[in-house]
Structure formats: C-alpha cells, structure tokens
C-alpha cells in the first residue's frame, strides 16, 4: 500500500439478478434531481444543467444489499489495513443508507470530494471513512467513473471503494447512450 491509488479497490460482490431487481424497483418510483450541499450557506441546490437523478433506498432494498456491501467492505479492510496492535482487524462497523443514482443521456456527476455530512442525523454518528459506489448495469456509453483523473472501469455487480477525503476527487462523465444505474453509500 505504497501508492495513493492502492486504496481504490473494486470487488464484484453484487449478484447480477439483484442488480436488475434494484433497477426495476427504482424505475417504478419517482426520481429526483441530485442536490449539492453548500456547507457555508447550509443550502442544497441542483445545477441548472446535466444534473443526474437520485432516489433513497427502502429499508427492504437496504437489507437485500447489505450482504454484498458487508462482503466488499470486509475484503477492503483486509487489503488496506496496516499490521499492528491497534491497526488490524475491523475498523468499519457501519455504512449509511444507500442512495441510488441514475445518469441518463446528457447527465453526469460533477467532480467533487466526499465530505458528506448529511448522512448523520443526530442518531447515527461517525466520520465517513470509505466511499462506496455500486454499479448496477453496464449497458450504457459515457458515464465513466474517474477518480484522481483516472478511469475506473466498472462492471455489473462491482462495488468500488476508496477513502472519503479530499485526496480522492471523483466524477462520472456525461452519459452519451443508455442509462447508468448505480448507488452510493459511506462506511464508518
């Protein structure tokens, strides 16, 4: 683990049939425009153009996705943990509710850092340590995931994990064909 990119890891842990089920269930509901949080003003706003759609998951969807997320996070911790009396073992114990993302033609996720505050509601407390992106399909063009200006190729069922801090700026490029379905969560 000598290079900063060593902490960007992809594991394929979501069954393809579960990915399809999640897409089908989400498309029976109403999507909303993504909003960016401005920590200075305390406001949430969407960009005027090219903003992707988002949707919270249901408790049932979260329960069905949990085994895949837990398996990926366990593997991540085994790979990136440093040996030592106080550094080994499990250091991630929870992850936030999933938020589904939908990038249709002409939309994107602009480059940003994951300095997420909104996942903590006063009852759930912690510091986001690992950003999680789950890829639910791959029958689209464009919508490439870039982290630190490098493309990370994702297949159906992949879970991408990386540290949730300013050293990992990331984005999803504009979708040019089809629709990209994914989800995000943060582990702490």
Predicted regions and their residues:
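Fe(II)/2-oxoglutarate oxygenase catalytic core
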Residues: 1-159, 167-188
């Amino acid at each position: 683990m000598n290079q900063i990119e060593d902490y960007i890891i992809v594991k394929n842990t979501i069954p393809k049939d579960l990915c399809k089920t999640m897409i089908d269930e989400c498309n029976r509901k109403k999507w909303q425009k993504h909003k960016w949080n401005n920590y200075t003003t305390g406001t949430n706003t969407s960009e005027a153009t090219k903003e992707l759609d988002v949707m919270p998951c249901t408790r049932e969807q979260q329960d069905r996705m949990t085994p895949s997320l837990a398996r990926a996070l366990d593997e991540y911790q085994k790979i990136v943990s440093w040996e030592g009396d106080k550094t080994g073992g499990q250091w991630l114990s929870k992850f936030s509710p999933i938020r589904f993302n939908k990038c249709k033609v002409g939309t994107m996720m602009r480059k940003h850092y994951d300095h997420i505050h909104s996942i903590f509601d006063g009852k759930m407390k912690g510091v986001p340590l690992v950003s999680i992106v789950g890829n639910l399909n791959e029958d689209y063009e464009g919508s490439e995931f870039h982290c630190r200006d490098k493309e990370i190729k994702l297949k159906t069922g992949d879970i991408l994990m990386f540290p949730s801090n300013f050293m990992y700026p990331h984005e999803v490029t504009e979708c040019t064909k089809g629709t990209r379905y994914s989800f995000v969560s943060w582990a702490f």
